[in-house]
Amino acid sequence: VKDSVYVGNAGKDAALDRGWILGHFKDVGDPRHSEAVEIKWGVHPRADARSQWVRGEERTALLVLISGRFRVELPGRSVLLEEQGDYVVWGRGVDHSWFAEEESVVLTVRWPSVPGYAAAEKDQSHPRT
């Protein structure tokens, strides 16, 4: 049972893998390995932005604001998350980008967990963002 349990701290563990705490990119055998879902604890300084839009999205995503002010850009629409617990969900085929209006912490859940979506090096998010 010990091998199928992992106890950690999202902030500390996220810092080790550019925010990602669960998904296909964790080692097989690690309870945090999953091809079904991926989870990110994103800590973003004020004015942090995704370096380029994600296009041809194959996943569904949920982004929940933990703290701060965070804007998600979607085709033809901008969504501003301002209160703790505000969230946005977008489905497959919806391109997106984001911008931290203030220092922000967001929790992102995406499914399924698939490789790809690399952003330019300037991006402080994980390549799977």
Q: Where are the language model's segments positioned?
A:
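Double-stranded beta-helix
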Residues: 3-6, 99-129
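A short, N-terminal "cap"/entry segment at the start of jelly-roll beta-barrel domains
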Residues: 1-46, 50-53, 122-129
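Short, surface-exposed beta-edge/turn micro-motifs
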Residues: 59-62, 85, 103-104
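Short, conserved beta-strand element in jelly-roll/cupin
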Residues: 55-72
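Short histidine-centered beta-strand/loop micro-motifs
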Residues: 29-31, 50-57, 74, 80-81, ...
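Structural motif
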Residues: 69, 95, 103-105
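Conserved hydrophobic/aromatic positions in well-ordered beta-strands
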Residues: 40-42, 63, 107
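Short acidic-glycine-tyrosine-enriched beta hairpin
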Residues: 76-93
